[in-house]
């Protein structure tokens, strides 16, 4: 019989909040007896935005801002229905985007 995998992908702008969320999810999943693989750090997306400092002239004077999106992957092997119920009830901070695939 092939083992089932639940993949949880977390995204956010602050890596510390993502790591705290991962620890909460691991603690909840291991409490139900499921095996957890990860956290696996995924590549960070970096978006750079360049704007002109002056409104009318001085095109050579520019300012750059960047926005980094940190990502982590967590795999739960052979999740039970109780594991899924517990994961639905985990309270996570705002600023963390979660994708769950079975």
From Swiss-Prot:
It holds the Pfam family Ribosomal_S10. Keywords: Ribonucleoprotein, Ribosomal protein. Transmembrane segments: none annotated. SMART domains: Ribosomal_S10 (SM01403). InterPro entries: Ribosomal_uS10 (IPR001848), Ribosomal_uS10_CS (IPR018268), Ribosomal_uS10_dom (IPR027486), Ribosomal_uS10_dom_sf (IPR036838). SUPFAM superfamilies: Ribosomal protein S10 (SSF54999). Signal peptide: none annotated. Gene3D superfamilies: Ribosomal protein S10 domain. One of its GO terms (biological process) is translation. The keyword Transmembrane helix does not apply. Involved in the binding of tRNA to the ribosomes. Part of the 30S ribosomal subunit. Belongs to the universal ribosomal protein uS10 family. This is Small ribosomal subunit protein uS10. The lineage of its organism: Bacteria, Bacillati, Mycoplasmatota, Mollicutes, Entomoplasmatales.
